[in-house]
């Protein structure tokens, strides 16, 4: 229950909170246990100094990448998710840049269809100054994500240990 609300419709830059919208949309496109190959092209789209999840060229489950986006706020993981989902949306797309662009275009359509009318995103990591959202849209996406037990499990921890498809673990803090 909300007791006080102020400026909830005022546009603001979402920064890393953009990843919440990316995760919400990506979870509608693929199964959490989908195996995603992180390739150099997608990882290299990450802005210098923002690869905090240390995603490597190997296989991850989609839910591993969601955890990497949420716990250490991994921009590298966000690009890998956008690349993977862009490939699902447009299998003929030839480059990582094209797949990420297609994902972002479709994400923005999805946002409008879901009622996030004051949110527009241009970068899956939120590392841009043109994106906009509102506190109201952020509240709605968080409420929607909190319906999922996998999301609650990830965000309830400040350290997350992921089991990768090869059986090895990776820890994010």
Enumerate the language-model features and the residues they cover.
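Domain-terminus/edge residues, biased toward the C-terminal soluble/receptor-binding domains
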Residues: 116-117, 129-137, 142-173
């Amino acid at each position: 229950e909300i007791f006080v609300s102020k400026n909830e419709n005022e546009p603001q830059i979402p920064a890393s909170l953009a990843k919440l919208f990316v995760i919400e949309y990506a979870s509608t496109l693929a199964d959490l246990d989908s195996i995603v190959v992180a390739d150099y092209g997608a990882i290299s789209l990450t802005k210098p100094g923002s690869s905090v999840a240390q995603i490597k060229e190997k296989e991850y489950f989609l839910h591993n990448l969601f955890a990497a986006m949420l716990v250490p706020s991994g921009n590298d993981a966000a690009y890998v998710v956008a690349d993977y989902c862009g490939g699902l949306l447009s299998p003929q797309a030839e480059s990582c840049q094209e797949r990420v662009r297609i994902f972002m275009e479709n994400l923005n359509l999805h946002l409008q269809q879901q009622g996030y009318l004051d949110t527009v995103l241009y970068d899956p990591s939120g590392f841009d100054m043109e994106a906009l959202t509102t506190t109201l849209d952020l509240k709605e996406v968080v409420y929607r994500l909190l319906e999922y037990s996998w999301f609650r499990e990830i965000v309830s921890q400040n350290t997350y240990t992921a089991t990768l498809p090869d059986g090895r673990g990776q820890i994010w803090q």
